[in-house]
């Protein structure tokens, strides 16, 4: 014991270094003194020998040996005596002690205790719970069974990377080993799975906004290593953050844009309100029809072809107040992912894009909150831990924009109007164990408008979901999700009691998803699973809204359908440079009764006059089934770690359609499920791209080109009545669409100046090629779609003067969208009327807008009770009256031409944000 | 219903937006298309107006002439006579025969046009023509109530003609005659005054109604005209004559589309304008666009008067017709500066007022009094 203590200070490492250069000696000694013996050995081998001379001055030694290691030779000399030889390899020292041996290293058990499981198991070994989170860069962590006799070639290392301060998992961090370039990116749960050679390894970890770090591991077998990373706070030096850029070049997916909330917070938007949807619209390939549009168009797709998911719930109307604000509280959003081209096999049901918005988990370490006050909206967020394993977030947002209506002129008659919205979020995250995690999310939003005590209009989004994540072993994980989505709107009038009415629409969905990810071998990762959604849609209910109203009650039959899919996808790394992603998704859609429907003469367009039979479907009986496979393929060839080319092809189908005859997503658009008369929409996209990063991955560039076709896209007929139409199939036509384009993007995400510039050229056209149509639009030729804007240039940039002051600017330029204009006029019924051109033959003037904002963070002390941020800016700096539409109105029987702009002048704003 | 929804959205946009006059450039004009406004009425009143579309920049309309007939499907043809260039009427009395359909037939510039054969419709009597003061918008709403027991769904069109007496706010005893260059006395008992005038107007757009959404064919209190505050219609006596026509569903859809194309297209949620096909075709070239819809129906007329003192809220108040000025060099000087005589006589200096306060011709009126006007104002 004393010896141990005595030599403790000499011990620096618990590892013995094997392989130190060892000298071999030869001895031929006869009856020599200890001193002579020692001298010979020391001379030949370089060792130093220690002893208590008093013990051996009377001894004489004889030893013969040839090419022996010094310790062995010395031991031979003392054989049969009471002396023992101890070796201290690290220092090339030998000790000769009477009847005792010197312990020259601390026992392996000294620092930790290991539980031994049965040998030969591939399960990992639990470290002491104290050691679960690897927080030190210098400590070497042992993974696996150290006492195993054989080391495997490859070892599977898994774990979760989380934020040191809040305990939240970190998404998109890259952990890799430099020499073999074996790497992995953490998924949505911060989970990574990495295959490495056994032995001593050094792993580098990079995460956006986090300090670059490393971990040392000694790998004996498969094991787990959870890592906590520190946030990179207030460092004035440049930070080399490469995870995002590596991710883009390395991944097989094309047309994917990932953004973290930090990227979103600095982009100036109208009224200083951080807006997730507006940021999405700044990305190349994403267009909108105009500033008041609540929908967006991705690569030539219409607004209903985007699947918008918020914590797995489908959102039908992603904005508040006609597109001025997004429906997502930015304080709760963690990241957004927009899939424009390669849509992963686990998603389906829309043919143009998937926008996935994921909320954060609550802070697991301490209770915090944020309050934000802006010109038009305010929000509050509270979060914190509940016990050791649970965390929560509550968020709320509301508007008080009535004041802007109060500014309207008296004689507009709408001075006393009210427009408002609020939304509420509640998230609960519970970790049962390392293997099981439950995430529950609830969202509710409500918009209501009341202009002059007459028209009232409102809509509601409500979503609830529960997600259970289970890790079976280090190669198989699964997520099971279930939820309920609801969207409804209503409009009502009361002014004239005789025709006061109320119109309601609603859609409900119940869904369940089982998603598995299996890291079968280090070359193949399989994703497979099953999704099922039950739709229940009420297309319209029209009721009288006063006692004396003569309105007849009318209701369109409810629609029900079940959409079930199974999918299987394989990410196959054929060689480290070439990897492909192959996926198949098979969907079956069943339209369910009760329903009474008409079948029409197939040789003519469905019309009230040519129905041939009326069918009835029973309750929950399937009366029409559509089923087909969808293919998702993409491939990447990486010439080097910063240069790759990719190509992909996807087919997709959509079974729910928005029926609208307005250019933008209007509040009264109706949705319809496919049934016996409405076929599913089909889409096909092929795309290819070149991706190169420059200057040590600080600048990302990409060029992507695509070609898309759409079939059975629903367009409406002339004079169509789309509201409360019992036979809406008689007012719509199947149209074909095509879109193609090229997108160029340059992105810089570090340094004082960061942001992106993009240019896109694209065309989107539609054609009515159904031969049954008598008088097709544009005579059956291709005509421009409403959102066809060939040239588009976008710039979003942020310049940090210091850590406290930064300037943000964005510019948006695009060709004017197509419109249908009058081309001549005539007299009728005592007034002037216009005759319109073929659809979308002309364009409104080009669109250009520039916004600027200045962000100030008054104080940066980490230990202050509250942190605040002020943002001052101008929206539409140049004040350009970007035409939203051009039209003619008859005034007093004469026509006058007008141009309407949404934001016709520069709009300054101030917003204030406190975090506590 | 949708119209109101869209209008308030437009007004929200006004607060922070701009609606500015604009003329799109580079439009390929579709002038020269045939426009046919044709209504067959029994017993009298049939009228067909022919014209062509003109470019948006032009101002004058050119009527079209040719041969116009009404055909019945049992072989009778009725020729219409051209009363004015481009306007054709049926002089004689016309009676609809049982189970007979009628079509419009025209030969213009060597091209032969014919409409589809339509079944004549019978227009019901108007149940009530009423008016109400609308406090919120400070206007008078003129409303119609009607029902039609003969059909399942009723579609109506209305037209109106207004005549009203314009009374100047003040009676000027004299006026300056710029041609004779002298002062003339205004006489209340002869037309030689500027106190009483008359004006007229008529409907300039489609006024349509449908009972599709209602429990019966009754449409109650449908506003067909609005008298805004500040005009001269209710300065003394107002008369409106409303004509009602029954339409069928196709004609209604066609006209409603035409009206929407000039009414709702500007707003954010405007539906895309489209052109619907009418029911008149060029027999040799069915692809030729012909604008218009031939309708065969009957006409029901109803009228009413509204007196100014029935609607005191509509009297123009707080105007500057209270200010009396005296310092002009003479009546000619006042006239040149836009002022007219209020009083003129020996003994006191003349008093002047803004011309439109003493002269009803400056308020949109003329001295042409309709023969049937029920009072003896001159």
What positions do the PLM features span?
Chain A
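Gram-negative outer-membrane beta-barrel transporters
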Residues: 706-709, 728-823
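Face-selective signature of the C-terminal outer-membrane beta-barrel domain
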Residues: 429-446, 458-603, 702-707, 748-756
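N-terminal periplasmic "start-of-domain" segments of outer-membrane beta-barrel proteins
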Residues: 21-26, 48-62, 149, 154-156, ...
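Periplasmic N-terminal accessory/gating domains of Gram-negative outer-membrane beta-barrel systems
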Residues: 119-148, 185, 209-211, 223, ...
């Amino acid at each position: 014991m004393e010896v141990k203590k005595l030599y403790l200070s000499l011990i620096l490492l618990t590892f013995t270094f094997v392989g130190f250069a060892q000298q071999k000696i030869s001895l031929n000694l006869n009856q020599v003194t200890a001193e002579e013996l020692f001298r010979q050995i020391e001379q030949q081998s370089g060792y130093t020998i220690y002893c208590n001379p008093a013990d051996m001055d009377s001894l004489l030694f004889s030893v013969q040996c040839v090419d022996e290691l010094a310790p062995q030779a010395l031991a031979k000399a003392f054989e049969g005596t009471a002396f023992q030889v101890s070796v201290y390899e690290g220092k090339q020292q030998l000790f000769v002690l009477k009847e005792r041996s010197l312990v020259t290293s601390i026992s392996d058990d000294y620092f930790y205790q290991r539980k031994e499981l049965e040998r030969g198991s591939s399960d990992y070994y639990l470290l002491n719970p104290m050691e679960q989170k690897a927080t030190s860069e210098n400590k070497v962590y042992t993974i696996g069974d150290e006492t195993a006799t054989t080391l495997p070639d490859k070892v599977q290392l898994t774990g979760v990377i989380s934020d040191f301060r809040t305990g939240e998992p970190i998404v998109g961090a890259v952990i890799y080993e430099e020499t073999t370039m074996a790497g992995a990116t953490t998924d949505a749960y911060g989970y990574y799975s990495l295959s490495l050679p056994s032995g001593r390894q050094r792993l580098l970890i990079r995460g956006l906004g986090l300090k670059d770090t490393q971990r040392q591991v000694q790998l004996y077998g498969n094991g787990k290593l959870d890592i906590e990373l520190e946030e990179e706070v207030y460092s004035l030096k440049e930070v080399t953050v490469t995870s995002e850029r590596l991710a883009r070049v390395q991944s097989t997916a094309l047309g994917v844009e990932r953004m973290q909330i930090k990227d979103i917070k600095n982009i100036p938007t109208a009224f200083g309100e951080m807006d997730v949807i507006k940021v999405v619209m700044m990305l190349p390939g994403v267009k909108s029809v105009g500033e008041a549009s609540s929908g967006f168009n991705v690569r030539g797709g219409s607004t209903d072809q985007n699947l918008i998911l918020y914590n797995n719930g489908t959102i039908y109307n992603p904005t508040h107040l006609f597109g001025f604000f997004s429906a997502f509280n930015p304080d709760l959003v963690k990241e957004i992912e927009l899939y424009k081209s390669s849509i992963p096999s686990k998603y389906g049901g829309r043919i143009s894009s998937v926008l996935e918005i994921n909320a954060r988990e609550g802070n697991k370490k301490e209770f915090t909150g944020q309050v934000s006050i802006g010109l038009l909206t305010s929000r509050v967020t509270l979060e914190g831990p509940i016990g050791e394993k649970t965390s929560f977030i509550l968020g709320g947002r509301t508007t008080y924009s009535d004041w802007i209506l109060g500014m309207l002129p008296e004689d507009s008659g709408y001075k006393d109007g009210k427009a408002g919205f609020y939304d509420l979020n509640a998230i609960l995250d519970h970790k049962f164990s390392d293997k099981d995690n439950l995430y529950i999310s609830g969202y509710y939003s409500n918009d209501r408008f009341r202009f002059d005590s007459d028209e009232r209009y409102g809509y509601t989004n409500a979503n609830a979901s529960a997600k259970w994540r289970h890790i079976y072993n280090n190669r198989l994980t699964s997520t099971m999700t279930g939820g309920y989505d609801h969207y409804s709107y209503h409009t009502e009038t009361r002014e004239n009691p005789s025709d006061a009415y109320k119109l309601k629409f609603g859609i409900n969905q119940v869904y369940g998803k089982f998603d598995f990810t299996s890291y079968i071998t280090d070359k193949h990762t399989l994703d497979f699973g099953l999704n099922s959604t039950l739709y229940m849609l009420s297309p319209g209910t029209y009721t009288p809204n006063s006692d004396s109203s003569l309105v007849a009650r009318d209701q369109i039959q409810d629609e029900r359908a079940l959409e079930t899919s199974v999918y299987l996808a394989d990410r196959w790394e054929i060689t480290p440079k070439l990897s492909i992603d192959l996926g198949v998704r098979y969907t079956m859609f069943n339209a369910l009764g009760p329903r009474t429907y008409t079948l029409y003469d197939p040789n003519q367009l469905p019309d009230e006059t040519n129905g041939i039979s009326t069918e009835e479907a029973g309750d929950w009986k399937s009366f029409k089934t559509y089923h087909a496979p969808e293919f998702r393929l993409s491939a990447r060839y990486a010439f080097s770690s910063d240069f790759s080319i990719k190509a992909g092809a996807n087919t997709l189908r959509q079974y729910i359609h928005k029926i609208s005859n307005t250019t933008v997503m209007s509040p009264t658009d109706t949705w319809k499920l496919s049934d016996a008369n409405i076929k599913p929409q089909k889409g096909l996209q092929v795309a290819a791209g070149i991706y190169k990063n420059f200057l040590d991955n600080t600048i990302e560039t990409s060029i992507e080109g695509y070609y898309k076709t759409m079939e059975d896209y629903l367009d409406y007929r002339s004079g169509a009545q789309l509201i409360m139409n019992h036979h809406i199939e008689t007012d719509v036509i199947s149209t074909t669409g095509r879109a193609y384009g090229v997108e160029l993007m340059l992105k810089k995400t570090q340094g004082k100046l960061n942001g992106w510039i993009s240019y896109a050229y694209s065309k989107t056209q539609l054609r009515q090629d159904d031969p049954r149509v008598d008088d097709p639009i544009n005579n059956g030729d291709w005509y421009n779609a409403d959102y066809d804007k060939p040239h588009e240039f976008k710039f979003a940039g942020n310049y940090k003067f210091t850590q406290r002051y930064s300037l943000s600017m964005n510019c948006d330029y695009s060709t004017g969208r197509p419109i249908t204009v009058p081309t001549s006029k005539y007299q009728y019924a005592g007034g002037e009327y216009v005759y319109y051109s073929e659809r979308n033959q002309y364009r409104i003037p080009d669109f250009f807008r520039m916004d600027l904002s200045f962000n100030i963070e008054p104080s940066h002390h980490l230990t202050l009770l509250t942190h605040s941020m002020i943002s001052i800016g101008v929206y539409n700096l140049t004040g350009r009256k970007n035409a939203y539409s051009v039209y003619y109105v008859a005034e007093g029987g004469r026509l006058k031409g007008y141009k309407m702009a949404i934001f016709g002048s520069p709009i300054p704003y101030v917003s204030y944000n406190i975090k506590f | 219903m949708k119209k109101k929804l869209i209008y308030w959205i437009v007004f929200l946009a006004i607060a922070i937006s701009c609606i500015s006059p604009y003329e799109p450039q580079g439009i390929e004009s579709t002038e020269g298309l045939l426009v046919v406004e044709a209504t067959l009425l029994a017993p009298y009143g049939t009228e067909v107006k022919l014209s062509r579309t003109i470019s948006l920049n032009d101002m004058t309309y050119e009527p079209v002439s040719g041969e116009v007939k009404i055909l019945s499907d049992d072989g009778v043809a009725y020729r219409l006579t051209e009363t004015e260039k481009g306007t054709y009427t049926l002089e004689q009395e016309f009676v609809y025969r049982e189970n007979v359909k009628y079509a419009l037939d025209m030969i213009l510039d060597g091209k032969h046009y014919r409409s589809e054969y339509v079944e004549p419709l019978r227009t019901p009597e108007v149940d009530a023509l009423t008016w109400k003061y609308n406090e919120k918008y400070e206007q008078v709403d003129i409303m119609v109530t009607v029902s039609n027991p003969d059909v399942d769904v009723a579609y109506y069109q209305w037209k109106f003609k207004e005549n009203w007496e314009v009374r100047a706010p003040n009676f000027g005893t004299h006026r300056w005659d710029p041609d004779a260059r002298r002062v003339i006395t205004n006489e209340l008992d002869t037309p030689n005054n500027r106190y009483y005038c008359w004006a007229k107007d008529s409907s300039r757009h489609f006024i349509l109604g449908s009972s599709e959404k209602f429990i019966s064919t009754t449409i109650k209190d449908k506003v067909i005209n609005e008298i805004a505050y500040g005009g001269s219609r209710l300065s003394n006596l107002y008369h409106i004559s409303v004509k009602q026509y029954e339409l069928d569903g196709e004609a209604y859809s066609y006209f409603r589309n035409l009206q929407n194309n000039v009414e709702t297209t500007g707003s954010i949620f405007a539906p895309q304008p489209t052109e619907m096909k009418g029911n008149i075709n060029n027999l040799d070239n069915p692809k030729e666009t012909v604008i218009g819809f031939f309708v065969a129906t009957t006409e029901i007329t109803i009228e009413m008067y509204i007196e100014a003192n029935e609607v005191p809220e509509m009297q123009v108040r707080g105007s500057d017709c209270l200010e009396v000025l005296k310092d002009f060099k003479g009546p000619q000087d006042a006239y040149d500066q836009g002022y007219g005589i209020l009083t003129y006589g020996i003994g006191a200096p003349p008093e002047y007022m803004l011309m439109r306060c003493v002269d009803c011709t400056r308020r949109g009126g003329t001295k042409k009094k309709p023969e049937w006007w029920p009072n003896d104002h001159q």
